[in-house]
Amino acid sequence: KITPLKNEVLNTWKYFLKKIPKDCYLPNPLWAMEFGATYPFKETTPHALGTRKLKKFKGKFGINLRKFTKNQIFSNVPAYARLKVKKFPNWKVNMIMNSRKFYKNNKTSVDKILESIINLKQESYQKLEWNCRGEKYNLIKKIVTFRGSGVRIKRNGQIPTLISTCMAQTPYLPWKKRYIAFEECLKIQGFDK
């Protein structure tokens, strides 16, 4: 059975998918902490910029960094952006850019659910990996995995490999309201014989 917290996470993203325009492009992954953020990320990083200059920007979910002390500023920037590096790798720049662009293009729809996403607290629950390109934005007949990298949604019938199916990442079947049994996973992957 799913925990109340994971049920809240699932319901939040289910509602999010219901609220966004059906024809919009959903980047994969979607990092919701970038909704409203303005801190620099293309040519520099928050760490390289320093707290004095960083105060001029907005952190995760558009939080104004000006109101925070030097020690509080970095806790209001997403964890993945706190790295002590001068420049982010291109893949990270693209993910941040795509998430911010999605928010800019869909702000009216996203703002209807944003507070619920913010209330999820744990950053991994504030990231959505939609691996169902071209399908309707609906969670019910999909396979959900709660991962450190985010809430991963896959097509029904696409089960993660056994290697990645540790206890913390067991696939959840929303339409059956239960986790997949280990034996089912073995059978799907042809190891039941």
Residue positions per predicted region:
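Conserved beta strand-loop-helix elements of the APE1-like EEP
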Residues: K1
